[in-house]
């Protein structure tokens, strides 16, 4: 049985990704933050929930090491943890940037690094990190300075890791969604047409495809999933 990690497993996207991989025969290990009370109703024999603060480097490394000791390898990882904040240049202090850096980059790097090293040993594996338009395109980050800067480093990380993994079967991909159709966004953006947005299940489908054997020859560093948003 193949093994996948999904960070932020209790979020809208996280749950969709967990379900997709379980439905396709994976054993999924999902991370949640301490004191997360969101119920996760997945089959116990196919899903393992682990509480870990990915902002803490040592805890993140221990999580990966424990997982490898238990399962031997990891085939795919989908890193959905992150945070969001509004703010123009005038409104954004370095402390705001530091917070978004920690939420959006450190939480990804702390787990991507040990996973990357393990996958290089295996000579196989896919890591997917959820990016954002403001991180990819500065013009899309107007009014989201700290958030855009924090997310932008994810793209550079993927480039550097892919360069280091050249010649292996290890690929790091940044998935850039448009507006995601979630209850929270429907409440926050009234009057918009959710049909133009991207459903979490659609993102999960695309991620699973790129993790599957069908996409073994593809090495896409960035996947844009915008719909009409």
Regions found by a protein language model. Give the residues of each.
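Rossmann-fold scaffold of SDR-type NAD(P)-dependent oxidoreductases
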Residues: 7, 74-82, 104, 129, ...
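Amphipathic alpha-helical dimer-interface segment in Rossmann-like NAD(P)H-dependent oxidoreductases
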Residues: 103-121, 162-163
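Active-site loop of short-chain dehydrogenase/reductase
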Residues: 2, 73-74, 119-132, 167-171, ...
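Catalytic Tyr-X3-Lys loop
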Residues: 83, 90-109, 124, 128, ...
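Catalytic loop of short-chain dehydrogenase/reductase
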Residues: 126-159, 163-166
């Amino acid at each position: 049985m193949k093994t996948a990690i999904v960070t932020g497993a209790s979020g809208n996207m996280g749950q969709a990704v967990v379900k997709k991989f379980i439905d396709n025969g994976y054993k999924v290990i999902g991370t949640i933050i301490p004191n997360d009370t969101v119920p996760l109703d997945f089959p116990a024999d196919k899903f393992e929930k682990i509480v870990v603060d990915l902002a803490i480097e040592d805890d993140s490394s221990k999580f990966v090491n424990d997982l490898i000791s238990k399962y031997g390898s990891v085939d795919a990882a989908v890193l959905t943890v992150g945070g969001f904040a509004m703010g123009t240049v005038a409104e954004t202090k370095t402390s705001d940037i530091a917070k978004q850096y920690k939420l959006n980059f450190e939480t990804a790097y702390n787990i991507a690094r040990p996973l990357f090293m393990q996958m290089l040993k295996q000579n196989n594996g896919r890591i997917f990190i959820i990016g954002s338009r403001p991180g990819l395109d500065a013009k899309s980050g107007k009014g989201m300075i700290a958030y855009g800067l924090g997310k932008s480093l994810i793209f550079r990380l993927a480039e550097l890791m892919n360069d280091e993994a050249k010649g292996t079967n290890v690929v790091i991909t940044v998935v850039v969604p448009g507006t995601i159709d979630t209850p929270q966004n429907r409440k926050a953006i009234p009057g918009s047409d959710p049909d133009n947005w991207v459903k979490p299940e659609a993102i999960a489908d695309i991620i699973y495809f790129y993790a599957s054997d069908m996409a073994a020859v593809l090495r896409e560093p960035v996947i844009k999933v915008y719909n009409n948003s």
